[in-house]
Amino acid sequence: MKNKDKDKSTGVLLQEQLGKKWELAWKDISDKDAVIVKEISDDYIRFLTAGKTERQCVKLSVDLAEKAGFKPLEFYQKTGKINPGDKVYMIHKDKTVVFFEVGRESIEKGMAIIGAHIDSPRLDLKPSPLYESDDMAFFKTHYYGGIKKYHWVTIPLAMHGTVVKKDGETIHISIGEA
């Protein structure tokens, strides 16, 4: 054992010997690239701030896609034609969306697919959630999407949701946002 290691615990020595030493990427990044990373990060934070639910994320994604030239599948169905390079999207139940660009080569040569999903941390109401106790009404809930039970006290409380009435009318709810 080296003289400088004699005061280190066995655990520390094992960590140094077996553990991965992570280097910060910021050490090697150029000032120009740091600005680009900051801009992308800021855009992502704005998206996360505005997209609290799947429905909000779908709407935001479609708005961005339309600015980039994407059109809904219905547009192409009406025209009856789709061409190589066309940018298409399709929304399903306002909670999922698919984007694709029609390839310029035949499908026999393959295709490139990128997949992602929307995972909005939240509390969901359970089926038949309403109950009464001690002259108060309560909802039975469960948490979803990576929410940490112990983090909620440090986050401003807000309620976002969608109610679909019997007649099909949709009401969007947002309470508690600044």
Feature-to-residue mapping (PLM):
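N-terminal hydrophobic/helix-forming segments and targeting peptides
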Residues: M1-A178
